[in-house]
Regions:
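Glycine-rich phosphate/diphosphate-binding loop of Rossmann-like nucleotide-binding domains
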Residues: 68-80, 177-283, 287-290
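Phosphate/diphosphate ligand-binding glycine-rich loop within oxidoreductases
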Residues: 56-177
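A short helix->loop->beta-strand "cap" motif at the edges of active sites that frequently abuts
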Residues: 147-154, 220, 319-327
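Positively charged, low-complexity intrinsically disordered leader regions
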Residues: 1-76, 80
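Charged helix-capping and loop-helix junction motifs
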Residues: 103-107, 205-210, 284, 309-312
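Peripheral docking tails and interdomain loops at the edges
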Residues: 154-194, 324-338
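Glycine/Thr-rich phosphate-binding loops of Rossmann-like dinucleotide-binding domains
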Residues: 128-130, 201-202, 276-277, 336-337
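Glycine-rich phosphate/nucleotide-binding loop
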Residues: 270-338
Length: 338
């Protein structure tokens, strides 16, 4: 059994100095040591809580949350994390703030950052907008700190944008590491990141993109499966390919769910919207073309309905040769093993 000193020794062996006074936008922005440091701290905090050791780091301070899209699990996870470390959470509701009266991002960012140690932002609805907003927000905060308006520069944590969902994907990755007994046991394991039918049409691409962008860094054989037309961002696919080449695993694509499931050690069913359609939706909203948006929604719902057979079923699972698989169901945030 590990001790707290074991985790401290592990952290001392890693180089993560650049994370200080920096932000967490995407996992592929971080080095291997930096990702391992995050996993190590997470394990250390769990050890401390389970052994009744205080995890309080701050005597006071704020954790600011800004959710520009609906959230349950991430909202409560962020609040729980802040509480665990000694921060009080303040949630900024843009509809109830001066933003609704035309206040700029620069003004808002600096105002809410007084006494803040961390800012968590979710902005995942529109392609090309979410990550850009997070960057603009933190550029304003950085400038405010340099100009002496803010005594300190809070850190941003991406709570999901249009490109990546790092907090969820890293939580899933750490669970997989635990399940297989360590990072060293992941090489050669097959994970199928598969599209699955949902009656709604507009789910973000950031989860499948986050999964292929992170899990290809661990020597795993990562398969991205979806019906024709449900592609993700090509630049994230390129990142996944480069990760696989560098780390000895593989990254492949298929339009056959059963093929993706075959011999998989882990399957990750998740619905998402087609990248091209989400780009079009963003343009329609920018133009104020609500008739066009309504038409697009009907087209996408009809397109989704053609793929109801893309479902994680007992029948599909029974066709596979392996007797054990790890299922990650993000719709319910449950981890099931069969």
């Amino acid at each position: 059994m590990k001790t707290l000193q074991d985790y401290i020794d592990k952290l001392n062996s890693l180089n993560f100095k650049e994370m200080y006074n920096n932000d967490f936008f995407w996992t592929w922005d971080k080095t291997d040591d930096e990702l391992e440091a995050v996993f190590t701290v997470a394990d250390a905090l769990r050890f401390m809580r389970e052994n009744n050791i205080s995890t309080k780091v701050f005597e006071s301070g704020l954790g600011i949350s800004i959710f520009r899209d609906n959230s349950t699990r991430t909202r409560f996870s962020f609040a729980s994390a802040c509480n665990l470390l000694g921060l009080e959470v303040q949630d900024l509701d843009e509809k109830k703030s001066q933003i609704a009266h035309g206040e700029t991002v620069r003004e808002t960012a600096n105002m809410v950052s007084f006494m803040a140690d961390v800012i968590g932002i979710r902005d995942d609805m529109y392609i090309g907008k979410g990550h850009a907003y997070q960057k603009e927000f933190m550029e304003a905060v950085t400038e405010g700190n340099k100009d002496g308006i803010l005594e300190q520069r809070p850190t941003l944590v991406n709570l999901q944008c249009d490109v990546d969902h790092p907090t969820q994907c890293m939580a899933d990755m750490l669970h997989i590491i635990h399940e297989f007994g360590g990072v060293e046991n992941l090489k050669g394991k097959k994970i199928a990141m598969t599209w699955a039918y949902s009656p709604s049409y507009g789910k973000p691409l950031s989860v499948p993109q986050g999964v292929i962008g992170l899990m290809t860094r661990f020597g795993m054989d990562v398969v991205l499966a979806h019906p024709e037309g449900y592609d993700v961002m090509p630049e994230v696919e390129e990142i996944a390919k480069k990760n696989a080449e560098k780390n000895g695993g593989s990254f492949t694509k298929t339009n056959d769910m059963a093929e993706a499931f075959k011999d998989a050690d882990i399957v990750y069913p998740k619905s998402w919207a087609p990248f091209a359609a989400m780009e079009k939706r963003t343009d329609l909203y920018a133009e104020g073309d609500f008739d066009g948006i309504d038409k697009l929604e009907k087209e996408l719902l009809a397109q989704n309905a053609q793929h109801k057979d893309w479902a994680c079923t007992e029948e599909l699972n029974e066709k596979q040769q392996k007797t054990e698989k790890l299922f990650t169901c993000t719709a319910c945030r449950l981890i099931l093993q069969v």
